[in-house]
Amino acid sequence: MLITADKEAKIIIGNNVRLNGPTLIASRQIEIGDLCILGSAVVFDTDFHSVHKDRSTNRDAPVRKSPIKIGKNVWLAGQCAVLPGVHIGDDSVVGFRAVVTKDVPAGVIVAGNPARVVREISEESRHS
């Protein structure tokens, strides 16, 4: 499912990307690099609604909006979530049901809520 919710929304999907039912909610840019794999029910969301007490009645309540960028050859396992402002480096893996709240360096495996690095991927493994 692709949802664009703002005039600044833009979704860019690279070459040879495998999409297995992700949800992309964009009020800013979402960019997915070449050769990525997105598992089932992966969610990308470039904005968060305010936690302000009158958010349901105040249309001007602040909303955090930031782009998301996924590098090349990244695998996002099923049911993970990528939150506003995150950049995931090339050749990384995001584990099942991980919640990615901050940037992920290239060549690592992250898992958990919030996602954290659990292992580095060797140069040899990245390109085999």
What do these predicted ranges mean?
Residues 1-86, 121-128:
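Flexible, glycine/small-residue-enriched loop-and-beta-strand segment within the central core
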Residues 87-111, 115:
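C-terminal/domain-terminus segments
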